Amino acid sequence: MSLSIDVTSLPSISSSIFKNESSSTTSTLSGKSIGRNEQYVSSDIEAFNKYMLSKSLEDIGPSDSASNDPLTSFSIRSNAVKTNADAGVSMDSSTQSRPSSNVGCDQMDFSLTKGINVSASLDSCVSISTNHKKEKSKKDKSRKHYPRIEADSDSEDYVLDDSDSDDGKCKNCKYKKKYFALRMRMKQVAMQLIEDL
């Protein structure tokens, strides 16, 4: 049995910071692509400082700050700057104050390509070879080979009388002596077989 698992590609996460208004995030999982576009406001340093200084400490929330983690350091979103347009940061002026170079806006590319190949095959070969001598059964072992019964008559002209015949089955038999010798021998063989059993 062989089991092989092949992972062709591990998850790879790449992030680059660009100064662009729109960012496309594409997630690829097993050949399926999901794309979405989100609008971001450029992180102009001077405008950001003015905006943060114009707000009180109680009004500053998590949406007003950016993380130092390059994977999650997005620019300030539009809903974070709509509250104070006098600070110089707005959706209309953000495109003009933004340079055309592709630096500053977050772009996160997360691609997951995973191939799993499981091959389980069970190859079994069973070979049974039996070579044994043919053993004789107990009956064959106990069987005795008896000598061949042969009886010769002294006189071939002897005719069996009806009184000596077995139920009249051997009438006028000229081999009476041979017949009686054969019958006596058969009785002995039958008695010996009974004793052996």
From Swiss-Prot:
Compositional bias segments (type: Acidic residues): 152-165
Keywords, alphabetical: Glycoprotein, Host cytoplasm, Magnesium, Metal-binding, Nucleotide-binding, Phosphoprotein, RNA-binding
Cofactor(s) required for function per UniProt: Mg(2+)
Ranges where the record places region Disordered: 130-167
Residues found modified as Phosphoserine: 67, 153, 155, 163, 165
Any GO molecular function: magnesium ion binding
Binding site for Mg(2+): 92
One Pfam family, short name: Rota_NS26
Family stated for the protein in its record: Belongs to the rotavirus NSP5 family.
Subunit structure: Homodimer. Interacts with VP1. Interacts with VP2. Interacts with NSP2; this interaction leads to up-regulation of NSP5 hyperphosphorylation and formation of virus factories. Interacts with NSP6. Participates in the selective exclusion of host proteins from stress granules (SG) and P bodies (PB). Also participates in the sequestration of these remodeled organelles in viral factories.
Name the UniProt record assigns to this protein: Non-structural protein 5
